[in-house]
Amino acid sequence: QKHSPTLNFENVLHHAQGDYIFLSDQDDVWKTNKVATCMKWLQKYDCVISNAEVTDEHLNILFPSLFKLLHVSKNKIYNALWKNGYTGCCMAFTRCVKDAALPFPKDIPMYDIWIGNVAAFLYKVKFIDDKLIYFRRHSLTISCNGKGSRYSLYKRLMFRVSIVKNIILLIHKIKGLTTH
């Protein structure tokens, strides 16, 4: 079976037992205050998305703000329909978000886009400007280089349709479970 970041993260989340989940990429470096800062916000919100400093492989700063580089919006409609604002390694969320997001729909573009939209449409999300990781980019990096999407306009539109469709299906599923 072909593996992808989405399938790998889905498998990991199925096994996650804690009340709080922090996503991480293997080559990013957490700052010492990441957990404490996110935990403070997770007392009021179900999902926290922090900013990051974008670095090269030697941790030299390339861009001081991931949010500015990617033009991150805090508006859930904008994030669902136009431009993704959710970067997995910058996310921490509660068990309820995890439980709602699983299992992942088969046609979602990427795990963090799905989790971020589930959190935004069903729970409370907080974007924080604190730069809590060094987001390392190098020649082997597959995702997020600030140079625009590698996908065609058609493919990006189909990703958005998939996210919106699956969020609507999830909302109907949850409402169906709570009305019976």
Residue ranges of model-derived segments:
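Conserved donor NDP-sugar-binding/catalytic core segment of glycosyltransferases
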Residues: 35-62
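Conserved nucleotide-sugar donor-binding catalytic segment
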Residues: 14, 75-146
